[in-house]
Structures are given as structure tokens and as C-alpha cells.
């Protein structure tokens, strides 16, 4: 796969937004064959590790997977390149068939999912960070400033071959934007790069 790296650093009088994105494209894949896609809820791991009292921590909102999946679906729908199945329609269709998005995340049986939704490819993702990063003091108080951090990966997978068509890695931080605003900016800029490379 061909890889593109994009680094952004926006400075203003009151804040700095750091953005790093990696874009991987499978150059050998016949991209024109992908016409209709569906975005399923991104995987949000449960971190059961106990961290040091003095180590930096980043919270992950429990609904981060659904939020980022919806943002990604909306951004892809703007392209006009794909027919994107509405996120609500995906949820309702799977519910009618007594299926859950979580089941496909664990089994990665995208062929069955593709048949159920009538799509050529599915967009899957994994959330690694989505919230505020802080370093606790021994007293239990937080050190300032608090920094919003988001980090996640997105992959477009062919439902027939399970082959990755393209993938992006998005990571960023901000001292002023909340996780939703920051994610929206990151997705918009990263997918603009992806669109350019695919055309």
C-alpha cells in the first residue's frame, strides 16, 4: 500500500492544535469497483490496565465509537464517490435481523455483513483516545492545562476479499477544542487528503 503522511501544526495566540495523519492506499486494488459502502460503529477498547498515579491519562468516552463512525459517514457522503448507507439505516437493518455491530467487530466477518447491508465495502475503525488527557497529582487534583486528545484508525474493507482498500490513522490534540470539534477538524482534513490521493 502507498503511504502518505500529513503533519499539521496550527498556532494562534491562545492555542496550539497538533495534528498528525497517515494515509495508506492499496494501489493494486480496483477502486472503481467500490460503489456502495456502510460505516459500522468503531471499536472502543476497555482499558483495564492500572496506570501509575503520576502517569498521564486520556479518558475515552463510552460512545466514542458511535460518534466517530457517524462523523466519518457524513464526511464520506460529501464526496459523491460512494453511496453511503445512513448510519441509522445500518443500525435499523441489523436490528431487524437480530444482529449487532459488535459481533462483526470481533469476528471480522465482513462478507456476511456486506450481504446483509447490500454493500461493496465496510468502513471499520478503532478508537485509541477520545477525551481529556491529564496528569493527576498525589492529592487527587489535576494538573493544568488539560489537553483534549483524539486518536483513531479507519479502514475501508472489501467485503468479498476482506482486503484493506485504504486506511487512515488520525491523531491530534488541542487545548481549546473539545473532542467532537477536534475530531471533526481532523476527519475533514485527513479525508480531503485521502480523496485527493484516490482521484
Where are these regions (language model features)?
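N-terminal post-signal-peptidase region of extra-cytosolic proteins
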Residues: 22-25, 57, 103-110, 137-142
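Envelope-exposed proteins and targeting segments
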Residues: 33-38, 80, 118-123, 146-153, ...
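Feature marks short, surface-exposed loop/turn motifs that line or immediately flank catalytic pockets
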Residues: 46, 131, 174
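Short secondary-structure boundary motifs at beta->alpha junctions and helix caps
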Residues: 60, 142-198
Amino acid at each position: 500500500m502507498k503511504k502518505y503522511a500529513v503533519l499539521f501544526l496550527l498556532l494562534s495566540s491562545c492555542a496550539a492544535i497538533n495534528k498528525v495523519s497517515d494515509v495508506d492506499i492499496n494501489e493494486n486494488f480496483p477502486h472503481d469497483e467500490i460503489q456502495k459502502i456502510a460505516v459500522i460503529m468503531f471499536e472502543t477498547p476497555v482499558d483495564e490496565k492500572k496506570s501509575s498515579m503520576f502517569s498521564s491519562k486520556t479518558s475515552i468516552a463510552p460512545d466514542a465509537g458511535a460518534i466517530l463512525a457517524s462523523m466519518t459517514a457524513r464526511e464520506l457522503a460529501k464526496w459523491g464517490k460512494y453511496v453511503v448507507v445512513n448510519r441509522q439505516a445500518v443500525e435499523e437493518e441489523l436490528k431487524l435481523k437480530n444482529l449487532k455491530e459488535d459481533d462483526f467487530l470481533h469476528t471480522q466477518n465482513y462478507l456476511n455483513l456486506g450481504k446483509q447491508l447490500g454493500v461493496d465495502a465496510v468502513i471499520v475503525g478503532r478508537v485509541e483516545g477520545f477525551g481529556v488527557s491529564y496528569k493527576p497529582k498525589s492529592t487527587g487534583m489535576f494538573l493544568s492545562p488539560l489537553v483534549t486528545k483524539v486518536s483513531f484508525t479507519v479502514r475501508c474493507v472489501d467485503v468479498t476479499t476482506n482486503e484493506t482498500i485504504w486506511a487512515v490513522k488520525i491523531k491530534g490534540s488541542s487545548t481549546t477544542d473539545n473532542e467532537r470539534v477536534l475530531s471533526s477538524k481532523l476527519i475533514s482534513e485527513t479525508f480531503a487528503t485521502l480523496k485527493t490521493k484516490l482521484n
